[in-house]
Curated annotation (Swiss-Prot):
Entry's Gene Ontology molecular function annotations: 3-dehydroquinate synthase activity; metal ion binding; nucleotide binding
Cellular component per GO, a single term: cytoplasm
Catalytic class of the enzyme: lyase
Cofactor: Co(2+); Zn(2+); NAD(+)
Reaction equations catalysed: 7-phospho-2-dehydro-3-deoxy-D-arabino-heptonate = 3-dehydroquinate + phosphate
Pathway recorded for this protein: Metabolic intermediate biosynthesis; chorismate biosynthesis; chorismate from D-erythrose 4-phosphate and phosphoenolpyruvate: step 2/7
Principal cellular location given in the protein's record: cytoplasm
Gene: aroB
Protein location: Cytoplasm
The organism of origin for this protein: Erwinia tasmaniensis (strain DSM 17950 / CFBP 7177 / CIP 109463 / NCPPB 4357 / Et1/99)
Family annotation (HAMAP family): DHQ_synthase
Designated name of the protein: 3-dehydroquinate synthase
Pfam families the record matches: DHQ_synthase, DHQS_C
Length: 360
């Protein structure tokens, strides 16, 4: 069992990583016997895990209710989140309840925002079931829903009480979702840890085969890096923005193509190549390193080009609605070398457009 702490003073919390955690109710600390909880999941995961997890928690004396939401990025909306509020109020659940987010990034983000909003804030626990959510979205307290004009535009910073990563969940993960998660894994190597990137180049086949030892090490390192960044810059005033490598371009793809048509990791993968090409055009990134990024993404089964049906000009309106835009000026996360990146402002739009065209 691996345990990492996200250090935020009184709001610090553990990330527990191991196989078989669903069989151990103590993994869900700080939940205790006699307390009330609402377990939020989706229609795909409910048949796989819901009854087992509820039975374990109820066996430990926790009073568990449940709400099952539709599955997909297109359902990460205020309207769907209202189903969680309705379920909480119907019982009813008070301020001492705990929301449990059992799912990937959509369930985690939506449930976290519901927890931040319900009766002005209740406790919640992240139980990520996809690789992407285990290494990224479940850690750090970013909660949100989408708007038709932009991804994650309505939300709050609200930290979980705990993150429970059961490695057994990856056994039921579709191959496309596994690849999507690997995009975020590769991102950490590009922006923060060149040695980790090299390790990924050597061990990617083991990760694709769901080798337990390799996967545990991979998830642990990603969570360590994310925890360090969040502890240093919880509200994304500087360092944490680097975690958005590829996201400004990628969110444009997701919004333009319709949420759910491109998985988040797929859009980020293409976006990271666009960011590398932008950095190349600015003379700050070695084309050979771009080739390493492209090679690793392709081996992971990820796209390295944007949608054929989307012109470069169609990216810009979405990119100008990005949350990193300040005073009407786009800010982009760009790599400097494998293992190091910067937040760059003032990049000319013609350079951005040319870099996108490089990836069409």
């Amino acid at each position: 069992m691996e345990r990492i702490t996200v250090t935020l003073g009184e709001r610090s919390y553990p990330i527990t990583i191991a196989a078989g955690l669903f069989s151990d109710p103590t993994s869900f600390w700080p939940l205790k016997a006699g307390e009330q909880a609402m377990l939020v999941t989706n229609q795909t995961l409910a048949p796989l895990y819901l009854d087992t997890l509820c039975a374990r928690l109820e066996g430990a004396g926790v009073i568990v209710d449940r709400v099952i939401l539709p599955d997909g990025e297109q359902y990460k909306t205020l309207a769907v989140m209202d189903q969680v509020f309705s379920a909480l109020l119907a019982k009813p659940h008070g301020r001492d309840t705990t929301l449990i987010a059992l799912g990937g990034g959509v369930i985690g983000d939506l449930t976290g925002f519901a927890a931040a909003s319900y009766q002005r804030g209740v406790r919640f626990i992240q139980v990520p079931t996809t690789l992407l959510s285990q290494v990224d979205s479940s850690v750090g307290g970013k909660t949100a829903v989408n708007h038709p004009l932009g991804k994650n535009m309505i939300g709050a910073f609200y930290q979980p009480a705990a993150v429970v990563v059961d490695l057994d969940c990856l056994d039921t993960l579709p191959a496309r979702e596994l690849s999507s998660g690997l995009a975020e894994v590769i991102k950490y190597g590009i922006i923060l840890d060149g040695d980790f990137f090299s390790w990924l180049e050597k061990n990617l086949d083991a990760l694709l085969a769901l080798d337990g030892t390799a996967m545990s090490r991979c998830i642990r390192r990603c969570c360590e890096l994310k925890a360090e960044v969040v502890a240093a810059d919880e509200h994304e005033h500087g360092l944490r923005a680097l975690l958005n490598l590829g996201h400004t371009y990628g969110h444009a793809i997701e919004a333009h193509m319709g949420y759910g048509n491109w998985l988040h990791g797929e859009a980020v993968a293409a976006g990271m190549v666009m960011a590398a090409r932008t950095a190349e055009r600015l003379g700050q990134f070695n084309p050979q390193d771009t080739d390493r990024i492209i090679s690793l993404l392709q081996r992971a089964g990820l796209p390295v080009k944007g949608p054929e049906s989307m012109t470069a000009e169609e990216y810009l309106p979405h990119m100008m609605r990005d949350k990193k835009v300040l005073a009407g000026e786009m800010r982009l996360v760009l790599p400097l070398e494998i293992g190091r990146a910067e937040l760059r402002r003032g990049v000319a739009h013609d350079i951005v457009l040319a870099s996108i065209r490089d990836c069409q």
